[in-house]
């Protein structure tokens, strides 16, 4: 914060206030409190269990798709994220076609180029699951991936 501002001179507030610009984020703090209350009411262990079930389900379904490469550890050692590639199809093409059917995933190097180099790929697809994801949405992802295979067959 500043102490005073004039056209010819500005003075700064005392420490630590001179490093805090603008209005304090009060609405954001209240929103964060509400989000914490919401998550605590559900229970973090319940959220983790749901995520694990979804990840296990997704890995099972995705592993049945011909030409599918899955990256990462088994379901019991990962969060609700699955990275994959579909043989012969660039990840951006996969993401674009899935988007047309209402399925949103990420495609690219995900800010981890050293890992992509280690895996020997330029990019991957990444699907994420959380509290609000339901198994039917994973089914929609899988159906979309079969459609991608048809386009590039």
Show which residues each predicted segment covers.
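Pyridoxal 5′-phosphate
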Residues: 1-153
């Amino acid at each position: 914060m500043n102490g005073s501002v004039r056209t010819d001179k500005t003075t700064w507030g005392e420490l630590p206030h001179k490093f805090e610009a603008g209005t304090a984020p009060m609405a954001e703090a209240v929103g964060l409190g509400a989000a914490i209350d919401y998550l605590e009411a559900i229970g973090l262990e319940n959220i983790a269990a749901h995520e694990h079930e979804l990840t296990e389900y997704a890995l099972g379904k995705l592993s049945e798709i011909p030409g599918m490469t899955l990256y990462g550890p088994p379901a019991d050692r990962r969060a609700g994220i699955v990275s994959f590639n579909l043989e012969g199809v660039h990840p951006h093409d996969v993401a674009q076609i899935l988007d047309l059917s209402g399925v949103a995933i990420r495609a690219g190097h995900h800010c981890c180029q050293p890992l992509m180099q280690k895996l020997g790929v330029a990019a991957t697809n990444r699907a994420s699951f959380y509290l609000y994801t339901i198994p039917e949405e994973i089914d929609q992802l899988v159906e979309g991936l079969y459609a991608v295979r048809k386009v590039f067959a």
